[in-house]
Amino acid sequence: MELKLHIIKSIQAAIAAGKAINTVYHSEDFGVEYKSDTSPLTVADQKSHEIIMNVLQDFDIPILSEEGKDAPYAQRKDWQRFWVVDPLDGTKEFIKRNGEFTVNIALVEDGRPTLGTIFVPDRDTLYFAAQGFGAYKLEDGPFDELQHAPANSAEQARILLGQIVEQSTQLPIEHPRQAALT
């Protein structure tokens, strides 16, 4: 039951963050700054991060976010469960205005991902998968269950991921969604 609540909250966080990203995306100024590693940081990155942190802080689970404070390894090495967040994955693509950016949220337990949520704001498309629940896509209507083969080992998962990467240049998105998610 607890995982179900995590799924719901991760979806709510991703969609709310994506809507904030889209507001900035369709504005004139992204407020681009550069981090110490010279990667770009926009107002959309910051707003998305704040929204996700506000939604997920209801749980007593640490959050490791690309835009958050650095948690030293000495602190996080003992985390049994934690959120991994990239509030705006593809900031360079966001700046190019090509629509190829996502909000990514994952829950890791005992070193293994148990939940993953990806929202594509420009296409209004949501993907999520959770251990014991399957994998789903939401675009233009109800959730569609995605077909997947079970990975029996880390090696099988690595091989499968390699095949997907070789055959794909972008997320499997057919058409932009017309109506906003509610």
Predicted regions and their residues:
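Acidic beta-strand-loop-alpha-helix segment within the catalytic core
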Residues: 106-182
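N-terminal subdomain of lithium-sensitive/metallo-dependent phosphomonoesterases centered on the IMPase/IPPase/PAP
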Residues: 1-88
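Conserved protein kinase catalytic core
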Residues: 72-73, 92-95, 126
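Residues that scaffold the ATP/ADP-binding catalytic core of kinase and kinase-like folds
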Residues: 24, 93, 138
